[in-house]
């Protein structure tokens, strides 16, 4: 199979990368009615598989899970999750032939095998769904021409898909129809109904393309969403301990600091996050962010280039063929870092404001990272709406996983594809930050408040203007207007 994106001519590539339309609420007036009465079979019962299925069932749809015979016989975790939640479970042979919609929610590396196994069993004219287009775009999977191929991609981990639904809301979602597979013209109706059933229409839906989803998703998760948080956690913890801070305090400041700081992003973007700082600290955070851009922008652009060209996917798939040797090695190395093995902060109290006051360089890393990722995507032809969701919007959700069990939890919750890309980025970013940024830090940049300095009103005005007028802030203000019912995730205590 050839990389689908690389088979397109330049005009087709630009067209697919630029597919992005924010859909009006009225387009979801029928909810998920198009799928009611139809048999929906989900293949895979991991985080996305289970939680999307729970939401869809609660929305009135007929959901069952098709698992491999050995997974059922051995009562593996996927079987246990599905059965304990009261779902019908069967083998591919038992459930696929009568399914109207088969949704493949297995890990990326399993997609080709799943397609090979289920495609011969699917009835004429059925539909096949993905929540990530890697198999179609990067592997060039060819799907039977009578089958409609759609994507509904919630922009957060599976656990949050469920939690937001239970709160009566949802998470922003990208939907798409594969242009090579829409024989009956029903693809968009299927994707819209699926998105509505998971709660996505309550938070905002972008009509996108498989190409735009994949390229922007890979960029976001490799850089700001995971790679930057991992690199930042490691270097900031090491710096705090080297400066004589209590390791337990340092651990808590980092582990819960990302979550607390990025909660402000969810409610009011980079502007609100920066406004949580004193004027002296805001100026310092802005200056540090500009320095971080100088140090890391070339790395951000390299990741974007490798994603667009297919170099990243071919490198990762070579590791798949080698039994994930690099992935497992890097995962083990992460588990041995000082931050991951730092003591628990039992009894240590940190107020919400203290996370901002004592984490100025962390705020700077978030600001710089979001803006670099957003700018790199937009410069590559990805629309601002997609770039926003794949950078700023998802960041609080990923930070929340670190608050639960540090980097281990983040890397467990994200996909293997995201984890692999995270390691590629953080392995380069960590030494750059350690060798160039950390030696530049001053008193008050990390671990204690920024000293008050005299403020030049014009300089502060210009900084505020620069923060508020960055394109990620302008589009973010528009998109957050749709999400008026957003609930707070959490703040550290």
Swiss-Prot record:
Involved in the biosynthesis of branched-chain amino acids (BCAA). Catalyzes an alkyl-migration followed by a ketol-acid reduction of (S)-2-acetolactate (S2AL) to yield (R)-2,3-dihydroxy-isovalerate. In the isomerase reaction, S2AL is rearranged via a Mg-dependent methyl migration to produce 3-hydroxy-3-methyl-2-ketobutyrate (HMKB). In the reductase reaction, this 2-ketoacid undergoes a metal-dependent reduction by NADPH to yield (R)-2,3-dihydroxy-isovalerate. NADP(+) binds at residues 45-48, 68, 76, 78, 108-110, 158. Belongs to the ketol-acid reductoisomerase family. Its EC number is 1.1.1.86. It comes from the Bacteria. The active site is at 132. It comes from Glaesserella parasuis serovar 5 (strain SH0165) (Haemophilus parasuis). SUPFAM superfamilies: 6-phosphogluconate dehydrogenase C-terminal domain-like, NAD(P)-binding Rossmann-fold domains. This is Ketol-acid reductoisomerase (NADP(+)). GO terms for molecular function: ketol-acid reductoisomerase activity; magnesium ion binding. Its cofactor is Mg(2+). Substrate binds at residue 415. It catalyses: (2R)-2,3-dihydroxy-3-methylbutanoate + NADP(+) = (2S)-2-acetolactate + NADPH + H(+); (2R,3R)-2,3-dihydroxy-3-methylpentanoate + NADP(+) = (S)-2-ethyl-2-hydroxy-3-oxobutanoate + NADPH + H(+). GO terms for biological process: isoleucine biosynthetic process; L-valine biosynthetic process. It holds the Pfam family KARI_C.
